UniProtKB/Swiss-Prot annotation:
Keywords linked to the UniProt accession: ATP-binding, Chaperone, Cytoplasm, Isomerase, Nucleotide-binding, Stress response
Pfam families: Cpn60_TCP1 (PF00118)
Organism of origin: Pseudomonas fluorescens (strain SBW25)
Residue ranges that the Swiss-Prot or TrEMBL entry lists as coiled coil: none
GO molecular function terms noted in the UniProt entry: ATP binding; ATP-dependent protein folding chaperone; isomerase activity; unfolded protein binding
Gene3D superfamilies named among the record's database cross-references: GroEL, GroEL-like equatorial domain, TCP-1-like chaperonin intermediate domain
Protein name (record): Chaperonin GroEL
Length: 548
């Protein structure tokens, strides 16, 4: 085991504080409408230019191991805020830096770190409760566009396109962000449930000009196994032919004799039919088949529940208004499922989203959720160069997270004003002892930090701006983009309550941990030249001279 170096008390905290400040100073340069860019060198290709706090934080690794511990803890603040609300990483970093710096002074002056932390925690709870009181619901398109604009560093085109996407697919719908091919941002919307499986044979195509198979008012057969024997399917095919409606088959696979028979029937016009593979693999495929069943009002034919394909009847089949199948995708529009069943399925998937700890599983569950709740919107980001494209795509994703957070928990006045107004909650708050009161005072000063930084990045005097905002009431604040004081909501400067809350809670949590650290342990740096020596000189290899 490698030897360790241990630092205690003030010398440990001082080193960590240096690391906190290095990381936070790099991140906070990006805060606000006049925040600057940070340029990051890459091991290959062009450098990345970004105004995204978490992207900057992730790149920082310090040489001194004790300083690096402090930096990594603040990086964790940015990541926590990002995981919880998808935005607010820079605000969280600025708050954490302020809490650590203010708290460090108090610890150095002889205050008890544990009582300080309790005071900070008490004040955080009070401010979070006050933020909830200040919060206003965010329901209309205009407010959603404003939130998106602010999060995308005051780019109104991004705010508008996100608001339009939310209007079209609903608050729960899936909105994905992709790299576009032009200079302008584009929005395309797919109605209904789409999954990434195309037709199993091009002979199912009935629209040769677009190479798609389109079925109007089809019946939908869902089978949780491979179909290779046509005899199993004959009863269902005969019933569908009598009903005179098209048929879509979604199964693990259709192959051999079964596929050939379906193609022949389709080409002769006996039964208008198309077959696709079920989406996903393993247990996820079973779950997605069940989703399609709920959406279309059908039953999955599965031997696990005692249903065989031979005994399937028209009652087991789902239906939809229209199905469009291309080479790679299938879209089911307006399924005939019962609304109550669909809502129950959505509630069940939401519970699974809340329980899962895997990011990949969460993403897949949210995709299923959106497919059930109607519609997928794709925002294609346009830009003039690849470097700009990456930077812009990151901003669009941030803005999308912020708008979702705003819809979920409402909005508060932006620009650091909500935190200043929430200070009223601390007016009569007292701790159990003098040191806890100092902890409350630490947070009281720290929550001014985002507004101070926004003002500083705009070239204004932070103390003057903070005093002016404190003397105002309600939504009165400072628009750093124009240098004007006024009603923040009317000026369209809004922050999602969830983003502000998550930023404060993450910052207070990590800030308290750093202040209560009494010992820090790191690997001892290896002495130069301590590695293994080179291989000894092996001399020439004899007997090789005659070889050319």
């Amino acid at each position: 085991m490698a030897a360790k170096e241990v630092k205690f008390g003030d010398s440990a905290r001082k080193k960590m504080l240096t690391g906190v400040n290095v990381l936070a100073d790099a991140v906070k340069a990006t805060l606000g409408p006049k925040g600057r860019n940070v340029i990051i060198e890459k091991s290959f290709g062009a450098p990345t230019i970004t105004k995204d706090g978490v992207s900057v934080a992730k790149e920082i690794e310090l040489e001194d191991r004790f300083e690096n511990m402090g930096a990594q803890l603040v990086k964790d603040v940015a990541s926590r805020a990002n995981d919880d609300a998808g935005d607010g990483t820079t605000t969280a970093t600025v708050l954490a830096q302020a809490i650590v710096n203010e708290g460090y002074k108090a610890v150095a002056a002889g205050m008890n770190p544990m009582d300080l932390k309790r005071g900070i925690d008490k004040a955080t709870i009070a401010i979070v409760a006050e933020l909830k009181n200040l919060s206003k619901p965010c329901a209309d398109t205009k407010a959603i566009a404003q939130v998106g604009t602010i999060s995308a560093n005051s780019d109104s085109s991004i705010g508008d396109i996100i608001a339009e996407a939310m209007e079209k697919v609903g608050k729960e719908g899936v909105i994905t962000v992709e790299e576009g091919t032009g200079l302008e941002n584009e929005l395309s919307v797919v109605e209904g449930m789409q999954f990434d499986r195309g037709y199993l044979s091009p002979y199912f195509v009935n629209k040769p000009e677009t190479m798609v198979a389109e079925l109007d008012s089809p019946l939908i057969l869902l089978v949780d196994k491979k179909i290779s024997n046509i005899r199993e399917m004959l009863p269902v095919l005969e019933a569908v032919a009598k009903a005179g409606r098209p048929l879509l088959i979604v199964s693990e696979d259709v192959e051999g004799e079964a596929l050939a028979t379906l193609v022949v029937n389709n080409m002769r016009g006996i039964v208008k039919v198309a077959a696709v593979k079920a989406p996903g693999f393993g247990d996820r495929r079973k779950a997605m088949l069940q989703d399609i069943a709920v959406l279309t009002g059908g039953t999955v034919i599965s031997e696990e529940i005692g249903l065989s394909l031979e005994s399937a009847t028209l009652e087991n089949l789902g239906s939809a208004k229209r199905v469009t199948i291309s080479k790679e995708n299938t879209i089911i529009v307006d399924g005939a499922g019962v609304e109550q069943d669909i809502q129950a399925r959505i509630t069940q998937i939401r519970a699974q989203v809340a329980e899962t700890s895997s990011d990949y599983d969460r993403e897949k569950l949210q995709e299923r959720l959106a497919k059930l709740s109607g519609g997928v919107a794709v925002i294609k980001v346009g830009a003039g160069s690849e470097v700009e494209m990456k930077e812009k795509k990151a901003r669009v994703e941030d803005a999308l997270h912020a708008t979702r957070a705003a819809v979920e928990e409402g909005v508060v006045p932006g620009g650091g004003v909500a935190l200043i107004r929430a200070l009223e909650a601390l007016t009569n708050l007292t701790g159990d002892n003098a040191d806890q009161n100092v902890g409350i005072a630490v947070l009281r000063r720290a929550v001014e930090a985002p507004l101070r930084q926004i003002a500083a990045n705009s070239g204004d005097e932070p103390s003057v701006v903070v005093n002016e905002v404190k003397n105002g009431k309600g939504n009165y604040g400072y628009n750093a983009a124009t240098g004007v004081y006024g009603d923040m909501i009317e000026m369209g400067i809004l922050d999602p309550t969830k983003v502000t809350r998550s930023a404060l809670q993450a910052a207070a949590s990590i800030g308290g941990l750093i202040l209560t650290t009494e010992a820090a342990i790191a690997d001892k740096p290896k002495a130069e030249g301590a590695g293994g020596g080179g291989m000894p000189d092996m001399g020439g290899m004899g007997g090789m001279g005659g070889m050319m």
